[in-house]
From Swiss-Prot:
Residues 224-250 are annotated as: Disordered. GO terms for cellular component: cytosolic small ribosomal subunit. Binds the lower part of the 30S subunit head. Binds mRNA in the 70S ribosome, positioning it for translation. The keyword Membrane does not apply. GO terms for molecular function: mRNA binding; rRNA binding; structural constituent of ribosome. This is Small ribosomal subunit protein uS3. NCBIfam families: rpsC_bact. The gene is rpsC. GO terms for biological process: translation.
């Protein structure tokens, strides 16, 4: 029987890039991989309330000292920064002590967390841990993702659903999610929810569009980052009011006065 592979790994090197980038000798690679795992574990634990969606680590050797540049994508940058960037500075100092290298931490805001698979899976897991209905949690996540500009979404929850004695899987799907098309930008993530009846597994697939030759993965997600307007449509500023047609308003006022005078007579 054919099994479903991880869409992120299947598209790695085709339309997706690596989240860890380094130039090192072959003998140093195992230690750097272990160090990257420690960095990711530290950031996920300390910034869990900020909604971490992605961590990119890039290593550059500057003169005699090695520099580690980290891009932390979060949905709540205010929590990640803290008052006067106190939380960020504390994290940088701890990472420098952990790695014994210079660390640069860049916090980037995720503008549309409703269509990021990692954050959607985490949101469903939190609702299930708070005893919410697994059907309602999935349907609400699908509605928010489609409203934010996703072209397709699929969710799946597995385990003792509703406290049943026998475990089963139940999921929902809306739109297109082409898993066999390699140029299709499919975002995939998993999460776990710890409930009184055991652990529930959550899987989320979100389709953003096709990445054509000469484009990057950002081009499929960029048109909807600023809002729900269509491709190529400009958003009107809040203070920019539509121009009033004075002649039309005068005609409406004249007709209103005419009917009022006619009723009086």
């Amino acid at each position: 029987m054919g099994q479903k592979t991880n869409p992120n790994g299947l598209r790695l090197g085709i339309i997706r890039t690596w989240e860890s980038k380094r130039y090192a000798d072959q003998k140093d690679v195992p230690a750097l991989i272990k160090e990257d795992a420690l960095i990711r574990e530290f950031l996920n634990e300390n910034f869990s309330k900020a909604g971490v969606s992605q961590i990119e680590i890039e290593r550059v050797k500057a003169k005699s000292k090695e520099r580690v540049t980290i891009k932390l994508y979060v949905s709540k940058p205010g929590i990640a920064l803290g008052k006067e960037a106190s939380v960020k500075n504390k994290a940088v100092s701890n990472l420098e002590y952990l790695t014994k290298k210079e660390v640069i931490l860049n916090i980037i805001e995720v503008r549309r967390p409703e269509k990021v698979a990692v954050l959607v899976a985490q949101s469903i897991a939190e609702q299930l841990e708070n005893r919410a209905s697994f059907r309602r949690a999935q349907k609400m996540a699908i509605q928010r993702a489609l409203k934010s500009g996703a072209k397709g979404i699929r969710t799946l929850v597995s385990g003792r659903l509703g406290g049943a004695e026998m475990a089963r899987s139940e999921g929902y799907s809306e739109g297109r999610v082409p898993l066999h098309t390699l140029r299709a930008d499919v975002d995939y993530a998993t999460a776990e929810a710890s409930t009184t009846y055991g652990i529930l597994g959550i899987k989320v697939w979100i389709y953003h569009g096709e990445v054509l030759p000469g484009q990057s993965i950002l081009d499929t997600r960029k048109p909807f980052e600023a809002g729900n307007q269509r491709r190529g449509q400009k958003r009107r500023p809040r203070n920019d009011q539509p121009v009033k047609d004075l002649n039309k308003e005068k005609e409406i006022a004249r007709r209103t006065n005419y009917y009022v005078n006619a009723k009086k007579n």
